[in-house]
Amino acid sequence: MNNSWINQEIIIKNKLIDLLPNKIYNLKDKSPLIDFINSQLNKKYTPSEIYTVYIKYTAKPNEYKGKASAAINDAKGLYFINALGKDSSKPIQIWTQGETEGTSVWLPIIDKPNQKSTQEFQLTVPSKYVSLSNGLLVKQIDNKNGTRVDIWKMDLPHAPYLFFLAVGDYTIVKDNYKGKELSYYVEKEYEKQAREIYGKTPAMMAYYENILGISYPWAKYAQISGRDYVSGAMENTTATLHSDMVLQDARELKDGNAWETTIAHELFHHWFGDLVTAESWSNITVNESFADYSQTLWLEHSKGKDAGQYENYVGLKNYLNSPADAEKDLVRFYYKDREDVFDVVSYQKGGRILHMLRHLVGDKAFFESLHTYLIENKFGTGSALKLKLAFEKVTGKNLDWFFNQWYFGSGHPYVRIEEKYLPNEKKVLIIIQQNQLQNKTFTLPIGIDVYVKGQRNHYEVWNKNRIDSFYFNAASPPDNVNIDNDKILLWVKDESKTISEYAFQYAHARNFEDRLEAINDAAENITDSKAQSILKAALEDSFYVIRMGAIQSFNPANLDPATEKKILQLASSDPSNEVKEQAIDALAGLYKKEYKNLFTQWTQDSSYIVSGAALDALEKIDSSAALKIATEASTQKIRKRLNTSVTAILAKYGQENVFDFIAKQFDILNNQSAEKFYMTVAFGQLLHKVNDP
């Protein structure tokens, strides 16, 4: 142990850890305080001297009561799952969750993010189980008594909250990237799906290495899931832990890997969070904002520009839909509890701020700055200030205004946009007025596209005042003016456009959000012929989210035959199961018995969401047929929408004897899943039928 602030006293985190009698070398033991082991050393040590402390203890994590956060809903540190094996639906497991300071519940340690060390764990486990920890498994010793000692060694320094161990009955599926072992620990029944669930990890590594200019810095990478996990996932160094929601069967994966962006998020943490760690919880943005934004980067790279922009848009909306958080600074030097910083500001808002920063400096400088930040702080700590210095070093620009505004400030702009054509001057006037309540004015670099007679002219302006006016040449009234043309800014805007302008915008759209704005306005003006034209065109859009939005916009009661035919086509053969699901829902709203055979056929689709939508549609026109199919489906393994559809129909039309099935389905679902939330309604509906006081 080498600690520059120690001289003759050592203070170590101690949460419900009982010290046991032991010979302690070079240490005069004192009674522990409530939360710390506070001990006098035998002499004064200089910062360069190394000394060893031995502590014999028993940890009691089940007795610890700590505050949770929005991201992590418990704080025991170490968890025993189904330890006595009494629950036949759940395997026996042990796993740990260190963030924020849960490691010190089971391990006496200086439990702060700016403390880094190597580690070695010797785990005695039942021989039938496997273990996982940070670093490499360097040795296994058979005790000849049904147990085994696994020795895991981590020889590169990392923070205590990233210390990890897990034990359980897992199957290990091996992969490889540039000679480094990639391991996927799965429950036995998911062995065949392991590569489909985790198999993009090598491609993600290659992409992140390429944009950062830094190879994956650790000896191996393993991924594992834990039952009853208290969060979504955790980037424990070399050993990421996922919720069991990552485990998807073959039918689920037909609808796409719902956990792909989470896998990308946790991997990116191995640079931003593990290699360079936030120096304090106040600076958690340099961990979480980057991991959040990595999802946008990965989807943009792997699935195209629209997919990346959609991910960015969803993050923006998640932040904007939490107005109570708007007054929080991204870098939070003042908070009531460290858990409070894990919120939409540190994640989604921070990710959108990085998106603006990337656009401000350009891709080349953005990724070079990230490289510089990582190289200069590797195996150490980072902060927003260090990030700023890296960007200024690469770009040669003073970025005080950007970081003061977005990192060390709060809120976001609310703008009112007015457009006027001045025929005598042959100009278009754009007035941008900031109306946010805070006593602050944002500095905003804004890209503007002005379309005149089909020709696009691009301009770059700066909005630095509460009200700014901009004039642009226009020989005739513009077809459309697209402000924030690349949809970069984190703001709320209020602007009025005609349906003709939105029709032009959709037809000449350069990105996903332009088209989304157009179909949203068209949906509000559904009786207008131009709005109808926008929505009909959107039914054939190249991006599935736009097609879904267009379907949702039509009122089933007012569908014309051509549009109904198109929606039927989408329900039958769209490449996206989510679009099929939406189209079936739209057809269901017609209550046409002529679709009974199709709905019945689609209940057997290989996709859970398609079959579930079809079952709901069938129930609207023939509840007896739907009940029969739901009863048959209840004898099989079902998930996602098919599960919620089956349980809803059984609860509504079935007898008391369906209670056991629904109770079992409800019980086995992850508590954090949307599926369990929706099933709560059906479960409650069923209870009044059960005659069991």
Positions of PLM-derived features:
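Hydrophobic alpha-helical and helix-loop surface patches within well-folded domains
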Residues: 5, 152, 184-433, 481
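Non-catalytic accessory/interaction domains
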Residues: 97, 125, 148, 268, ...
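Short, solvent-exposed loop/turn and secondary-structure capping segments
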Residues: 64-78, 132-135, 162-165, 233-236, ...
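Ordered core of a single globular domain
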Residues: 427-431, 438, 494-497, 501-503, ...
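Amphipathic alpha-helical scaffolding segments comprising HEAT/armadillo-like alpha-solenoid repeats
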Residues: 495-505, 527-539, 559-572, 592-604, ...
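Acidic/His-enriched low-complexity segments
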Residues: 1-217, 344, 359-361, 377
